[in-house]
């Protein structure tokens, strides 16, 4: 972070730690956050890799949010996984279904974070008219279309 700031004082530093279920809103963790020299912490949700159950993610992000409020530093974002593994915990990454899983991930964690990033876009979502596709074309286009259907119904400013 110091090197980046020395090169560009306007830069914003972001980190994306993994294994959110281990973090507690205790004094030790809050002290770590107070000493952290980054503007944004975007915790990986772990749902796609199976490390976090969807039904537990809200509780984990709530704990993290409380710790960030106590520390008074670093904004909290989420790095939400859009995929699942073909073979439980290994194999190809395949696009999750927006209506059956991803929207529920967003609903669970959004009360506790400022923004949601996604991991990963390339190979998981593709515009139908793209000249080059990564991943399984039909599945990645399906997820893109599901997301855009939802997005276009929102009233974002």
How would you describe each model-predicted region?
Residues 1-157:
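Glycan-processing catalytic domains of CAZymes
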């Amino acid at each position: 972070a110091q090197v980046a700031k020395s090169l560009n004082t306007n830069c914003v530093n972001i980190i994306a730690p993994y294994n959110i279920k281990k973090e507690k809103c205790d004094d030790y963790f809050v002290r770590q956050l107070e000493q952290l020299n980054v503007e944004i912490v975007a915790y990986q949700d772990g749902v796609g890799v199976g490390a976090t159950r969807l039904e537990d993610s809200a509780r984990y992000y709530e704990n993290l949010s409380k710790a960030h409020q106590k520390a008074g530093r670093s904004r909290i974002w989420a790095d939400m996984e859009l995929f699942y593994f073909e073979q439980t915990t290994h194999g190809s990454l395949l696009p999750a279904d927006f209506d059956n899983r991803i929207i529920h991930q967003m609903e669970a964690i959004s009360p506790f974070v400022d923004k949601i990033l996604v991991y990963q876009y390339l190979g998981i979502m593709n515009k139908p008219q793209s000249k080059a596709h990564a991943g399984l074309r039909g599945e990645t286009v399906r997820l893109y279309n599901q997301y855009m259907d939802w997005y276009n119904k929102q009233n974002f400013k």
